[in-house]
Each structure stands twice: as C-alpha cells, then as structure tokens.
Amino acid sequence: MTVEYTASDLATYQNEVNEQIAKNKAHLESLTHPGSKVTFPIDQDISATPQNPNLKVFFFDIDNCLYKSSTRIHDLMQQSILRFFQTHLKLSPEDAHVLNNSYYKEYGLAIRGLVMFHKVNALEYNRLVDDSLPLQDILKPDIPLRNMLLRLRQSGKIDKLWLFTNAYKNHAIRCLRLLGIADLFDGLTYCDYSRTDTLVCKPHVKAFEKAMKESGLARYENAYFIDDSGKNIETGIKLGMKTCIHLVENEVNEILGQTPEGAIVISDILELPHVVSDLF
C-alpha cells in the first residue's frame, strides 16, 4: 500500500536525523579512553598487501558479535531502516516490514535490495540510518572484551585480527571507538556503499574474497571466523576456513540462518578462550 508523505514530514525527518548526527559526531570527537582511536589504515591499497601463505587471520564480525545482541541496537537499527522504507518508498509500516525482511533474508543487507530495485543512494541511506543511531547511549568501553583481544594479540598465535562487517565503515569505526577496542585490529573489510556497482556483502563468496585480499590471507585454512549469522558461517565453512564460530546469544535468528554443521557455537564472545584455547 502506498502512503503519501508531505514535504513537511520529510523535512521533520531530515532535521531530526541531522540533529542526532551532530550529537553523535561531537561525542565521538570527545572520546579519550584507551582504544578510542583507530590505529589501523582504512581503505588500504589492496595491491600493496602481499598474500602470505603462512599468514593466520582471525576475522571478527562487529554487530551483535563484538557487542551483545541484548543491547537492542539491532532493534534501533530496524526502526531506523523501516522509517527510511516508509518515507522514501512511500510504504505502510506493514509493507515496509515485509520488504525489509525480504531483502535482508535474500541479500544479507537491506541496502543491496534498495540499490538494485529502487536506485537508492546508498551513502544517503547510511547517513539517515546507521549514522543517526545514538550508539553512545548504549555502547561503553568494554574492559573484559579489550583484555581478551589483547591476550589474543599477544599470544603470537594469530598474525592479524581483522574486522569483517556488512556495515559501512562509519558505523564500524563508531562501534570500535565506543567499545574501546579500535587500537586492537589490523584492518577492516566493510560493505562499501560508495561502490553501488560492486556492492557485495556476506554471505556472498565475493565478500569473503574481498576480505581475503585486503587482509593478505592466502589460504582459507589459515582463517578463523566469528559471526552471529548462520548463513555467513556456512559460507566460511564451505570455503574451508579452519574454524568458524557461530555466536548465538539466546536463540537462532531464522532470517540469519541456522547453525551449519561443522560450526562451533558460543553465546558470548568472551567464551573464545575456551573454544579456541590453543590461540590464547
């Protein structure tokens, strides 16, 4: 069902978003706690990254993985996404919900469907949706997480800790800085919303190939991978990653997919030292 939104409605929407983004930026710039500054290069030149056959890489998803799904950030994100669907596609709340779920289930990310079928500007979508989330009201420095990642880095068993997310880089970096772990990773593979001609995301194999090239990984059997999506974990297993860990905090999300055979299941990322004890 088509719903008409007035120019006043859209102006109110834009103003609310702009005000929240300004607050988000001001807060981010004020951070001084350990791990609040990014120390790895972003958008590094792939051609300058040699593929090392002996390199061991641990790939980390971010959302609902480095922080708990019980923070309800996903719910906030869904509200923001649905508002975008309603205002920009002129849909009823019910139709927006159905279409969003359809794209998320089919492509792993709503924006991919929006770009493919509605010619949506992906960067504007990111600004109105992810950039406008008041993450600072929810995410705080996570000392236990930081200490665990430090142990993993210092063990000498893994060469690189690498972020692998379907979010755009803005959202990824905000999460890391707020959690106080932005200085513990070696790089970031994200869904590049500026490249709508080649927009790829997990669970697509091409997204994994991108992460492989950017990290310098030469062989999937030298890769460790943790994600809250069963579909993403399934791709990792099919590609031959050494260890794939499905993080299921409470129960499996049907849209994200069931736990595939061969995956390790944990309910909290702090369980990593118990399930891959040889790395710590």
Curated annotation (Swiss-Prot):
**Protein name, UniProt field:** Suppressor of disruption of TFIIS
Q: Which GO terms describe its molecular function?
A: nucleotidase activity
Q: What Pfam families does the record tag this protein with?
A: Hydrolase (PF00702)
> What does the entry give for GO biological process?
nucleotide catabolic process; pyrimidine nucleobase metabolic process
**Known function:** Could be an enzyme that inactivates 6-azauracil by modifying it.
Regarding protein family, the annotation reads: Belongs to the SSM1 family.
SUPFAM superfamilies per UniProt? HAD-like
Q: Which NCBIfam families match?
A: HAD-SF-IA-v3, Pyr-5-nucltdase
The signal peptide here is: none
**Which organism encodes this protein?**
Saccharomyces cerevisiae (strain ATCC 204508 / S288c)
User: InterPro entries from the entry?
Assistant: HAD-like_sf (IPR036412), HAD-SF_hydro_IA (IPR006439), HAD_sf (IPR023214), Pyr-5-nucltdase (IPR010237), SSM1_domain (IPR052791)
Q: Which CDD domains match?
A: HAD_5NT
